[in-house]
Amino acid sequence: MAVAVLLVLPFIILKLNAIFHRRGSLPAGGGREIYLAFPAPGSELEFIQAHAEVRIPDSAIEIHALINKSDTRVRFNLPPPDFSLFIKDTYCDQPFSALNPRDVRCEEHDPDWWRPGAAIDLEKCTGGNSYIHQQILKDGSDRGSLVIYVLTLMEAFETPSE
């Protein structure tokens, strides 16, 4: 058991170091808000994906992101056939379940584009690991285009004791 921990520990430390390095590059006064009408090579898409820990399909449009030191919120529109491609690269480890939009709390500091509570047909999926908690919300109100909400939270963790 101790040998397995020692073998895995360097990989965990490298991953956490990369996450803290990314988070440390954010402005001191708050988060960074980004809008992309469509994904373009060389754009800030890679920055968004790295912080949200998702892969946004090329067919996504109207991409909004708010990246803070402790969480990342992303919202984008996606054609329904591309949803299965997107969900494979998330931390969702449970099937989607219906969610009453009235049960979604909106905070006063939420950006204008973060409104899952306004959906008519909302589903959620959650997952994560020892340092990330991710929630995916799928708004299927418009059958021609899904609105996807991604909330990725940094989990509190403790340094392994010796």
Residue locations for each model-derived region?
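An acidic-aromatic pocket/loop used at catalytic or ligand-binding sites
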Residues: V5, V104-E162
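Extracytoplasmic low-complexity, Pro/Thr/Ser/Ala/Gly-rich segments
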Residues: I19-F76, F83
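Mature extracytoplasmic domains of secretory-pathway proteins
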Residues: R55, S59, I63-E123
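Low-complexity, intrinsically disordered/propeptide-like segments
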Residues: L9, P39-P41, Y149
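Hydrophobic membrane-insertion alpha-helices, especially the h-region
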Residues: M1-N17
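Low-complexity, charged, repeat-rich alpha-helical/coil interaction segments
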Residues: K15, I19-P27, I67-K69, D139-E155
